[in-house]
Swiss-Prot record:
GO terms for cellular component: voltage-gated potassium channel complex. Belongs to the potassium channel family. GO terms for biological process: action potential. This is Putative potassium channel protein RPA4233. It comes from Rhodopseudomonas palustris (strain ATCC BAA-98 / CGA009). Keywords: Cell membrane, Ion channel, Ion transport, Membrane, Potassium, Potassium channel, Potassium transport, Transmembrane, Transmembrane helix, Transport.
């Protein structure tokens, strides 16, 4: 059936997939992400090199041209992200204008706006080099979108903010107590360094952080005892937040970028009859993907590029009008998306996550190559699909194997 969605909505969703939902899984999304990261690094590198007078004098025009190119690229990205804002799950219920505004005032939207501000300042504002340098360096914050590690770290800081705030309060108390004790012990001996509690706080902060510049040291026995206690306290102060962040960071990384392991693949019923060697081979083909509750895996009418296995969680399949809009719910161990891949047609259903779901993604070309290697998989797919939908794939096993042979030849 022909997709009646307006062309501009299809285009908007396409760009949303490239920049957001499939930025880490689709080939085009990965290319665009790397392209943007390249311009972030280039822009920051130009800012650093421009601070060297000799390089600014010799390559000033080149730096200006490259900076203008970076600004143009960041501006295009920013305007596209404003346009695709209604595609974001939290903004689905909003009008396009409200969704665009919600994105613009979000933390990521503000960072994207800062990235293009040097262009606006250069065109309409004062030529203040210090302001431009600061704004250019703030582009490093864009890495939070393109680096899963930075996103995970920000998530950890957000989730553990109360514990970290408690550590900060304890550190402030320890600093004040240490500074007061050192002021009492050393204030009369070194009045220029410990004459007041605020003066002594510099020493306390440096000592508690275990940096120890050595510019201020105690001269009395009591002062050394206070310093020893402060050093031991500093080790504890550093260990507390480090342990909290490290443990939470490990949990977030495991939850977000889970590893495709042998037991995970072996639990999938479609692969349960295979040998250990075959499962090890399939492990190399599968990619891990985690989606949140309500997130769309793919929509009806989109090109089919991969099939999916549910490692954990649940999804809901909304079939098309030819199936009277019937909905099917699948859980852990099931698979979906194989029909369109094997028939080389567009998606006939829309799939959404019912809960936080971990998926194993198998590329269409790899699926056909796998069928050529293990024909029993094709037979089992036919059986499972027929039991699920009440109809056969209408593809003979020989046809599937033939498609696999063609795919292998194309990739050779």
């Amino acid at each position: 059936m022909r997709d009646e969605t307006p062309a501009y909505l299809r285009a908007r969703h396409y760009f949303y997939e490239i920049l957001e939902s499939q930025a880490q899984t689709s080939r085009m999304g990965v290319i665009v992400n790397r392209f943007i990261v390249f311009f972030i690094v280039l822009s920051v590198g130009i800012t650093v090199m421009e601070s060297v007078p000799a390089m600014r004098e010799d390559y000033g025009r080149l730096f200006q041209a490259l900076e203008l190119l970076c600004l143009v690229m960041f501006s295009i990205e920013y305007y596209i992200r404003i346009w695709i804002a209604p595609e974001h799950l939290p903004y689905h219920h909003m009008s396009p204008l409200r969704a665009a505004w919600a994105y613009m005032i979000s933390p990521q939207g503000i960072v994207d706006c800062i990235s293009v501000m040097p262009l606006w300042i250069a065109l309409f504002g004062p030529d203040d080099l210090r302001v431009l340098i600061i704004l250019r360096m703030l582009r490093l914050l864009k890495f939070a979108r393109y680096s899963s590690g930075m996103r995970s770290l920000l998530e950890v800081l957000e989730s553990e903010r109360r514990a970290l705030m408690a550590c900060l309060v304890i550190l402030a108390c320890a600093t004040l107590v240490s500074a007061t004790a050192m002021h009492i012990a050393e204030g009369h001996v070194q009045p220029e360094k410990f004459g007041t509690i605020p003066d002594a706080m510099w020493w306390a902060i440096v000592t508690l952080s275990t940096i120890g510049y050595g510019d201020v040291v105690p001269a009395t026995g009591i002062g050394r005892m206070v310093a020893s206690a402060t050093i031991i306290c500093g080790l504890i102060m550093i260990a507390l937040p480090v342990g909290i962040v490290a443990n939470a960071f490990s949990e977030v990384i495991h939850r977000r970028d889970f590893i495709v392991n042998w037991s995970m693949v072996a639990r999938v019923p479609l692969f349960s009859h295979l040998t250990a060697g075959d499962i090890a081979h399939i492990m190399q083909l599968l990619q891990a993907r985690q989606i949140e509750r309500g997130e769309v895996v793919f929509r009806r009418g989109e090109p089919a590029t991969a099939m999916y296995f549910i490692a954990e969680g649940d999804v809901e399949i909304e079939l098309g009008p030819e199936d009277k809009g019937r909905r099917i719910r699948l859980g852990t161990g099931h698979f979906f998306g194989e029909i369109a891949v094997l028939k080389r047609v567009e998606r006939s259903a829309t799939v959404k996550a019912v809960s936080r779901t971990r998926l194993l993604v198998l590329d269409g070309a790899d699926l056909r190559a796998l069928i050529a290697r293990e024909p029993s998989i094709a037979r089992k797919i036919n059986q499972i699909v027929e039991g699920r939908t009440g109809r056969n794939l209408n593809l003979e096993i020989a046809d599937l194997e033939g498609q696999a042979d063609v795919s292998v030849e194309e990739n050779a």
